Amino acid sequence: MSCFLQVMNPITGQNSWQERGDDYDYHLEVANAGFGDMLHDWERNQKYFGALRKTIAGMREAGREVHVLDIGTGTGILSMMALAAGADSVTACEAFLPMANCAEKILAANGAGDKVRLIRKRSTEIQVGEDMPRKANLLVAELLDTELIGEGAIGIYNHAHAELLTEDALCIPARARCYAQVAQSPLAAQWNSLKTIANLDGEPLLHPPEQLKSCQGEAALHDVQLSQLPISAFRPLTDPVEIFQFDFQRKQEREKQRAQLLKLQSKQPGAAELVFYWWDIQLDDGGEILLSCAPYWAHPQLKELAAEKAKDHPLPNVVPWRDHWMQAIYYIPKPLQLLEAGKSFHLSCHHDEYSLWFDAREEAPTKSVRRHTCTCDLHMTYSRGRIGQLNQSPRNKRYLRYLEESIEAEKSNVLVLGNGCLLGLASSALGAASVLLHEPHRFSRRLLESIVKHNQLKNVQFLDKVEELEDSQLAALTHIFAEPYFLNAILPWDNFYFGSLLTKIKDRLPEGVKISPCSARIYALPVEFLDLHKIRAPVGSCEGFDLRLFDEMVERSAEQAVSLVEAQPLWEYPCRALSEPQEVLSVDFSNFGQEHSLKGSIELKHTGICNGVALWVYWQLVEDNSPRSIVSSGPSEPVVPGEFVKWDMFVRQGVHFPRKPKDAVTHLEWSTDFKPLLGELNFSFGQKKL
């Protein structure tokens, strides 16, 4: 049976009814649950198994029976490990019903169907005597996220110890330790604050208003693959320090709120702008089996891991890769200037039941530091990537070069399309006679209005809809400008909404009006990822257990609910180019309604497994042959087959993951079908050996 859902099309900006199976949400949740990523984490799997073997053997030697509770069992992998390690009984719970049903089949396929009691409930809903026959004396669980406590681990462990576990119960993992490292990074700071926009001579055009300067930002974590942040892009001001420890094994309740004040000394001068954060877990009671989520430069096993890898393997990628537990950046509300090495300061660390936040001050705070929130609209409206993009100097210079060469003082009348288009607003500061700013988003508009007021721009008018433009306003236009950027965009070409807006006013525009960007081109590049492909790759077997039923479930759901191309910040996920990029679509915004159906083939020029295809957009600001007239949302340096691609760090690219990558492939065949007025842009890819 099917149903109809109203879906926003980012290219047309229109809501449309789409037919979906009544189990679409189920398939979407299964495909995006992220279980596969965890199952590809070999270190996690081996160390959980090792901790189970060691702990159960120790309990056996002490003459104890072993009754295991597995909270959030997923595929049932930890329950099967516990059985293999010698547990007397295993009870597993899983509240996500599709996963629980799959776990039941996997347990049966591995001969454990009648040995594991599977409960389809949250652990906090389980009753001893009703759901499980006795309290467990060994808890194994994976309830952690990048922040450690963001999935509710504190409350779940507290309930388990109070209701489901014996007084002498052991836990895997036994405890966790959280670490912080204070740093300065002009690059990372761009993700958090707005810089002055200057012209090509360095003279200020737009200053951030006071409300932006005084805003403390959002306390929420910025999760990143911190090992991929170039070592030259930050200045560590302290060594990593332990800030909190969580004892999952103790019977005493874990506090839901704590504060830790650390007096630190700077290793070198700099501004305490941000905190790098990660954690490690001791899986066994003795603390011998350690799993660390540290970035490579702070990883306790860096030397051993580097020795095991090939010489051409990048050092940042020798540590075990995982996407479910990353590292995080927290931004200091007001950066603290540390003018000399050895300067003392205080790092204030806080957590509640689900999150953390930090502050840095010269003097110790006299009262608890409250969790800060955005008061300026910037952080609550835009993603970290978009904030960084607004500050991206090389990118901004290309737009400003076009505007400075194109805008005539007191003569140009400019229509700006897009959300938060500060560059378009800069045309007012460059002397345009008038600027019409299309900004229908309430908070984005409020932010831009504050910038207009602060910079005393007198010739700016805001619009909710382009259809509301009067004929006289359109007739006077000399320029239409966009980056383009729209809040609803996920994939780079979702910003083709610029073309849809132009179509609405196309017949009313004067001849000779200059449109920038004038065109856009989508490029495709076959690549070999070191690790990112694992998020969509089948697992097969894991630590000797057959998980093919899980693979089949995910594949069925992915076929129905996952786009053939998804958005990823590729700077965080190294890949080698297997060829040069090839254009797969060109769009002329003066004739946006034209449909396209194209095919082609890319010859692979470097040996490797094509486990991904990267796609991005080149925006052509003006029709000339200058590379300075192109703004790329893809590689930031020329692509060389066989070498790692350097990607733009402030925008996500499109990625296609082949379902079954093939060996000895010589060509990637592609096709593109674009129906702009319907907002349909579809790609297909195939691998061939010719």
UniProtKB/Swiss-Prot annotation:
Entries under CDD domains matching the protein: AdoMet_MTases (cd02440)
Keyword field contains Mitochondrion: no
E.C. designation(s): 2.1.1.-
Claim: S-adenosyl-L-methionine is one of the keywords in the record: yes
Enzyme class: transferase
Alphabetical list of Gene3D superfamilies matching this protein: Hnrnp arginine n-methyltransferase1, Vaccinia Virus protein VP39
InterPro entries, alphabetized: Arg_MeTrfase, MeTrfase_PRMT7, PRMT_dom, SAM-dependent_MTases_sf
Domain of life, per lineage: Eukaryota
GO molecular function, one term: protein-arginine omega-N symmetric methyltransferase activity
GO biological process: peptidyl-arginine methylation
Keywords: Methyltransferase, Repeat, S-adenosyl-L-methionine, Transferase
Residue ranges annotated for the SAM-dependent MTase PRMT-type domain, each copy included: 14-357, 366-690
Its biological purpose: Essential arginine methyltransferase that can both catalyze the formation of omega-N monomethylarginine (MMA) and symmetrical dimethylarginine (sDMA). Specifically mediates the symmetrical dimethylation of arginine residues in the small nuclear ribonucleoproteins SmD1 and SmD3.
PANTHER family, per the entry: PROTEIN ARGININE N-METHYLTRANSFERASE, PROTEIN ARGININE N-METHYLTRANSFERASE 7
Record family assignment: Belongs to the class I-like SAM-binding methyltransferase superfamily. Protein arginine N-methyltransferase family. PRMT7 subfamily.
Protein name: Protein arginine N-methyltransferase 7
Organism: Drosophila sechellia (Fruit fly)
